């Protein structure tokens, strides 16, 4: 029997290399010995998490992340047929965007990519998003969580405004709120009544799982 840990390691490394062919090859090799859920969680997702860490350390750039996510998705698609019925159920629905007045996109995009890779259904509504649009999208998608990014101190208030509007609409008890972005902190999240603060993409995935699973 092949070394399962070694096979999963190969899958993770293939994702980090951002090469689809490598991922397909490694997944094909692993599926003979390893259950599909395990390949997704301990191979593909583990590799993607590592990509997130490397991105945060400045060792990889956004194009690499997008290519790795693409390569990972190819691997997941290959395994879909092997998954037991219902196994591909999404972990939860998340609306993610950057508040109005803020045109920064990169951090938020990587968070969306990582959440998607972890198995959440993510609706990325982009940057410079009006407060009401967060709420409307959450209603439309029946979201479990809203992720609000702000990259400037001047736009931080938008995070509070989304929470206030959720309360006004009677949705606050049903929809969790995660805040992030350079000027955001845990103290700020506590002050405005957010459910959690995430410093980076890996943390965003961990916190989302904590709150929604």
Curated annotation (Swiss-Prot):
GO terms for biological process: methanogenesis. It holds the Pfam family B12-binding. Pathway: One-carbon metabolism; methanogenesis from dimethylamine. GO terms for molecular function: cobalamin binding; cobalt ion binding; methyltransferase activity. SUPFAM superfamilies: Cobalamin (vitamin B12)-binding domain (SSF52242), Methionine synthase domain (SSF47644). Methylcob(III)alamin binds at residue 104. Residues 1-91 form the B12-binding N-terminal domain. The keyword Metal-binding applies. InterPro entries: Cbl-bd_cap (IPR003759), Cobalamin-bd (IPR006158), Cobalamin-bd_sf (IPR036724), Corrinoid_p (IPR012741), Dimeth_corrin_MtbC (IPR048095), Met_Synthase/Corrinoid (IPR050554), Meth_synthase_dom (IPR036594). Keywords: Cobalt, Metal-binding, Methanogenesis, Repeat. Residues 92-213 form the B12-binding domain. It comes from the Archaea. The keyword Transferase does not apply. Acts as a methyl group carrier between MtbB and MtbA. Belongs to the methylamine corrinoid protein family. NCBIfam families: dimeth_corrin_MtbC, pyl_corrinoid. This is Dimethylamine corrinoid protein 3.
